[in-house]
């Protein structure tokens, strides 16, 4: 989340690759959702898809709908000539096609709904993966076979994206398309399957070392990589996903991870709680508001404070109360691996693995 804010210059720091925060989130999301579904199937020999989708709706819909209403109101007041067009874009957002309208060139505008592109990919993943996983598990397909299939999908997506680059496809097509970004989600799914098997204790030190290498690799890319450079589109995005998966795997599999103190640091966890709303509202403030006459050169920081204030208000006054309804659609198994709870606050705006937000 913070990486995305920096990339959008709401936090005035210089990180060329801040946009990779979305990739980190995709991997983590695939890992957490798959882990939850696997635990439920192990405990009950079934997966309640109705409960899954009810919980997702209760988690995502309140802030999402309020944001879209605010976007329409601001558009009507600031740009009434664009209101009819904005209604159409909001309609695409409601059916989670924002990423495709940008990928296929239906409308490239960076309007208030543009930020929903990543949520659209996430929702498309929700629609396909849980039923498919339930079907595979019900048919007694071995974990190892599912893992191999996931690995092949990751490779296929990487090849597909590289082919598009070679053939001169537009960057928007490769960046926003579900078919070109799904590798990160499925790397997360693959990590969840791997995490079902406990590694020998003697491998923990190696795992920590590999996690450290992954952190170094990610920090380097986030600091230096170019959005328009060929590296990301010719395998780089997949390497980012694999490094993120390795980091998540190492933290999840080690009870004494060197990252644990950082990931359990309360300010990070608090930002994790409000990160979904913050991800939405920062974009609306960035595109449609200015505090320059009040804050001067501190305009970006003023927007950041305003975004955090709105996001926190949304979470505590609306989302948290509606989240209480989730108990009616509870999982019949423990929520998630304890160590995985540490991972979210740094990157994930949409999936909250805490007791309250799963």
Question: Where are these predicted regions, by residue range?
Answer:
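Hydrophobic membrane-embedded alpha-helices
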Residues: 2-40, 44-114, 121-332, 336
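Short, intrinsically disordered terminal tails adjacent to the first/last structured region
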Residues: 328-358
